């Protein structure tokens, strides 16, 4: 068997997430269906580096899978890209070592989150940016977001009931940019890993700080007390994008 690594992008609107689940359309299942056709009807299991939720998009999701024999990687990429549904794009395919695992190999991830703060909102972007209808002081967000950078226990920013025991993660980039032309906020977070719904919970908290309903020092308190109840609401998944995954050599 030969192992292949692929970078894919997808529009998450019509998917119930990346991971295969019964009675639901998922990214994993769509790609596996194509690979079965390319593998003479034999089953193929696709592994993903990130398990994006329903409605979440990706520019740079990484997957791996095994096929019998060696294939021309560009022909394989073309076949996967053209025979998989139009809301999935196969950006690249390469052959990798048999022990490579896209999820467990050491890597960093970058997420983007788009917030529509236009008045009126842009209805064409309703599936691709989260609309925020309330006033915001962007200087408060810019001040508070810096408290997320560094190595912290992010228990207060993960979904309750998560089975992950070690909730310490390192965030290397936490920034917000205002796109004045589109009237969008673009949040960017890079780090060595993110907990379940962590990015969406951080954005929900930052928006509440920007609206003046939480103090600017609230993030420091959440990190110190590890209390999800101190954080803001979970932002909707439609604004979230898995932008890039970089593996260490």
Curated annotation (Swiss-Prot):
Enzyme class: isomerase
UniProt keyword annotations, A-Z: Isomerase, tRNA processing
Lineage top rank: taxon: Bacteria
InterPro entries to which the protein is assigned, alphabetical: PsdUridine_synth_cat_dom_sf, PsdUridine_synth_TruA, PsdUridine_synth_TruA_a/b_dom, PsdUridine_synth_TruA_C, TruA/RsuA/RluB/E/F_N
Coiled coil: none
Family, as annotated: Belongs to the tRNA pseudouridine synthase TruA family.
Entry protein name: tRNA pseudouridine synthase A
The organism of origin for this protein: Streptococcus suis (strain 98HAH33)
Name of the gene: truA
């Amino acid at each position: 068997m030969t192992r292949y690594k692929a970078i894919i992008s997808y529009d998450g609107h019509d998917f119930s997430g990346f991971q295969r689940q019964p009675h639901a359309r998922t990214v994993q299942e769509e790609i596996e269906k194509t690979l079965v056709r390319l593998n003479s009807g034999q089953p193929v299991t696709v592994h993903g580096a990130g398990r994006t939720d329903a409605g979440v998009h990706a520019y740079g999701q990484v997957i791996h899978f095994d096929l019998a024999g060696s294939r021309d990687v560009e022909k394989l990429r073309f076949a996967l890209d053209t025979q998989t549904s139009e809301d999935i794009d196969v950006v690249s395919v390469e052959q990798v070592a048999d022990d490579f695992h896209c999820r467990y190999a050491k890597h960093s991830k970058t997420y983007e989150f788009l917030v529509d703060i236009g008045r009126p909102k842009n209805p064409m972007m309703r599936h691709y940016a989260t609309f925020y209808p309330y006033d915001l002081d962007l200087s408060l967000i810019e001040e508070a977001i810096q408290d997320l950078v560094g190595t912290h226990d992010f228990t207060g920013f993960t979904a309750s009931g998560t089975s992950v025991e070690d909730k310490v993660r390192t965030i290397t980039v936490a920034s917000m940019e205002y796109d004045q032309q589109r009237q969008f906020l673009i949040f960017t977070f890079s780090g060595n890993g993110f907990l379940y719904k962590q990015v969406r919970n951080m954005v929900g908290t930052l928006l509440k700080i920007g609206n003046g309903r939480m103090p600017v020092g609230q993030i420091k308190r959440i990190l110190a007390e590890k209390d999800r109840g101190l954080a803001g609401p979970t932002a909707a998944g439609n604004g979230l994008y898995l932008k890039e995954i970089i593996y260490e050599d």
